[in-house]
Amino acid sequence: MRVEETEVFKKYFKNLTDRERAVFEGGITLGALFHQFVGTPVSKYNKESLERAIEEAMKNQPCVYDIKVKIRNVGEKYVSLDGKMLDVDLKIKINKTVAHLKLEYIPEIDYPLMYVKKFEE
């Protein structure tokens, strides 16, 4: 049983709507991903395995329904992963609500932005 399926866990979130809870869990997951993996050595030779490792690690976070990680702008020589390179699509499911969240670099503001794309209910 996953931790989010236990009654003890659920009682701490009774004051939130399913949408609020999905955004909360998604923000924690994207923040954890960013701060855990930025700085990791990456090159074109290990890019795909690092993408899968990040996905599998983040699936351990509560309520993660699906996650896709792409690492952009990687050459032959290794570099340290930074926020400009991350392109992440995350789905968080709370009951019948699915929040679609995104982490991507936005050149116009020179910032790796985390945001909610949409909800399905």
Curated annotation (Swiss-Prot):
Family matches, as InterPro entries: DHN_aldolase_MptD, MptD_sf, MtpD_C
GO biological process: tetrahydromethanopterin biosynthetic process
Keywords: Lyase
pH-activity profile: Optimum pH is 8.3.
Residues noted as binding substrate in the record, renumbered to the chain: E25, M114
Keyword Iron: no
Any one Pfam family match given in the protein's UniProt record, by short name: DHNA
Pathway(s) served: Cofactor biosynthesis; 5,6,7,8-tetrahydromethanopterin biosynthesis
Catalytic activities: 7,8-dihydroneopterin = 6-hydroxymethyl-7,8-dihydropterin + glycolaldehyde
Similarity comment text for this entry: Belongs to the archaeal dihydroneopterin aldolase family.
Protein name per its UniProtKB record: Dihydroneopterin aldolase
Protein species of origin: Methanocaldococcus jannaschii (strain ATCC 43067 / DSM 2661 / JAL-1 / JCM 10045 / NBRC 100440)
